[in-house]
């Protein structure tokens, strides 16, 4: 889990647009965030296995 101070800091609008970054909406993780779902890879994987993300299925080839 992310620190509460970091989550609060990220909610403020940055002085410059370059300073903005994505953060997982479920756990607050700043790295490896999938933009389309606004989730980190770990949360995305958990929810996909449970079938809670519509239209997502495990790939096999």
UniProtKB/Swiss-Prot annotation:
Q: Which family does the record claim for this protein?
A: Belongs to the universal ribosomal protein uS14 family. Zinc-binding uS14 subfamily.
Which molecular function GO terms apply here? rRNA binding; structural constituent of ribosome; zinc ion binding
The encoding gene is: rpsZ
Q: Which GO terms describe its biological process?
A: translation
Species: Listeria monocytogenes serovar 1/2a (strain ATCC BAA-679 / EGD-e)
Gene3D superfamilies, per this entry?
A: 30s Ribosomal Protein S14, Chain N
According to UniProt, the name of this protein is Small ribosomal subunit protein uS14B
> Could you tell me which SUPFAM superfamilies the record lists for this protein?
Glucocorticoid receptor-like (DNA-binding domain)
Annotated keywords: Metal-binding, Ribonucleoprotein, Ribosomal protein, RNA-binding, rRNA-binding, Zinc
Source taxonomy lineage? Bacteria, Bacillati, Bacillota, Bacilli, Bacillales
- At which positions is Zn(2+) bound? 24, 27, 40, 43
């Amino acid at each position: 889990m992310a620190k509460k101070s970091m989550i609060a800091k990220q909610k403020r609008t940055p002085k410059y647009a370059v300073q903005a970054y994505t953060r997982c909406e479920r756990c607050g993780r700043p790295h490896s965030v999938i933009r389309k779902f606004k989730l980190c890879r770990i949360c995305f994987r958990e929810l996909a296995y449970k079938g809670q993300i519509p239209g997502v299925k495990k790939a096999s080839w």
